Amino acid sequence: MLKNIKTYNPLSDYNKVIKKLNNNGVRPTKQRMVLTKLLFEKGKRHVSAEDLYTELRKEDRRISLATVYNTLKQFTKLGIIKEVVVDQNKSLYCNNNKSHYHLYIEDEGKVVDIPTENINLDLPAFPACLNLHNVDVIVRVRTLKDIIKN
């Protein structure tokens, strides 16, 4: 007998994005929907604006790099994706909207999701006038071979 197997349904994410755009007064233009498809059709991932632009070019889509950046910025502001700043010159965009942290493997330039229950955080008490909005954690590691070289 088969147990419940969770399968990834990119159409679900696609429909959620359309709804979120409409709820925030943002038109789901063809360009936004092409980028949405690209962001979500391959499952959970971390991708740069340049990587998305390259994927668009391979599909012969005519969307400028500036439009890619603007759309990613807008999607981040709306909470559709998260920006993961891995260094001062590079951001990756995460399409996993469940609460989680990130592991950044510096020498590989790779980001991996870490479930929140795998990291314990002790946060200070906040004044009553403040409300905790979000906690971003990026754990930075290097592979042992990279450490030995340095």
Locate the predicted segments by residue.
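Intrinsically disordered, low-complexity serine/threonine- and proline-rich regulatory segments
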Residues: 1-41
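Basic amphipathic alpha-helical segments that dock to polyanions
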Residues: 68-78
